[in-house]
């Protein structure tokens, strides 16, 4: 996979090229990396296997990540399988109830490994996973025909206070840094607090989120 070449699991203390200037933040990170690795040995966020650095996955978990590929639904990227219709056809669920979007760019299919990565970032505080996950997402984005706005879904202020960060905002900022659009952090507004969506089905989630997020009138 092309995105794996950009995400090697190298030692955190690897010597940088002398031709690249180091920012104070990068210098501090390089200095503290061996100490961080000593206190918190690098582990795969999906299975717990030892790693060479704090960022990345073990080889076995990389192999278990399923990147959507052709043939797949032209609307939601649901895989058809080898015996299904050709690439770009529309799947039965999308035909039965056309979604209100122009298309989905899925970084991976939902399985045990991808679920653990999302939970590690969202509820485990593993914010160092954001750049890696953003690269997976960016690799699946279609070419932009004009200016692309990257608008993260906001958290309610109390949820943001409890968690300390908005995972959607972290991913959006990394995607902007990769050159895939312009970040607009205030494009949406959270109007009310909602319960945790964990364990809810699609219908229950839609019911809970109805009216909870609106477009910023500004």
Language-model segments: what does each one mean?
Residues 3-218:
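Glycine-rich phosphate/pyrophosphate-handling loop used in enzymes and phosphotransfer proteins
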């Amino acid at each position: 996979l092309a995105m794996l070449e950009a995400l090697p699991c190298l030692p955190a203390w690897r010597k940088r090229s002398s031709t690249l200037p180091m920012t104070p933040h990068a210098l501090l990170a390089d200095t503290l990396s061996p100490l961080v690795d000593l206190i918190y040995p690098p582990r795969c966020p999906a299975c717990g296997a030892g790693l060479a650095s704090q960022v990345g996955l073990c080889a076995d978990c990389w192999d278990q990540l399923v990147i959507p590929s052709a043939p797949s639904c032209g609307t939601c990227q649901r895989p058809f399988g080898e015996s299904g219709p050709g690439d770009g056809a529309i799947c039965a669920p999308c035909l039965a109830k056309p979604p209100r979007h122009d298309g989905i760019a899925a970084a991976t299919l939902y399985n045990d490994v991808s679920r653990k990565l999302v939970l590690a970032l969202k509820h485990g505080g593993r914010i160092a996973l954001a750049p890696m996950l953003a690269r997976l997402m960016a690799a699946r984005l279609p070419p932009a025909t004009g200016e692309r706005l990257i608008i993260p879904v906001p958290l309610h202020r109390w949820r943001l206070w409890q968690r300390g960060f908005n995972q959607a905002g972290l991913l959006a900022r990394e995607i902007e840094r990769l050159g895939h659009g312009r970040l607009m952090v205030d494009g949406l507004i959270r109007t009310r607090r909602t319960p945790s969506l964990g364990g809810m089905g699609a219908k229950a989630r839609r019911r809970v989120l109805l009216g909870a997020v609106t477009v910023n009138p500004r």
